[in-house]
């Protein structure tokens, strides 16, 4: 009985992350639909340049690069030197990689972005 309750709580916590009520709003869903409608990189550049500030876009790109480097087992020092990210940002991205919704890893696999370090 205890094991069942523990498993249910763990699943509920995972579902809670996936269905964050603060994030899952009609406005965010509409934004994601807009992103999914883009057909190429040029359209992405146009859209994101209109929607985001340059600093917001650069921050997103930096986090993506940090995540890639963390998955390649680079050190915080190497990552900070290459990307200019603070250790707080690197830690935040690392937490997402380890306890998040697997969004980074899903994209990395689809884009074949990680070096073959497992061999």
Residue ranges, per PLM feature:
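Short alpha-helical "recognition helix" segments of helix-turn-helix
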Residues: 78-83
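Short, charge-rich, low-complexity alpha-helical interaction segments
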Residues: 31-38
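Short, amphipathic alpha-helical "recognition" segments used to contact nucleic acids or chromatin
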Residues: 60-74
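Short, Lys/Arg-enriched anionic-surface-contact patches
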Residues: 43-62
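Intrinsically disordered, low-complexity basic tails/linkers immediately adjacent to helix-turn-helix/homeobox/MYB/SANT
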Residues: 107-119
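C-terminal structural segments of small proteins and small subunits
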Residues: 87-110
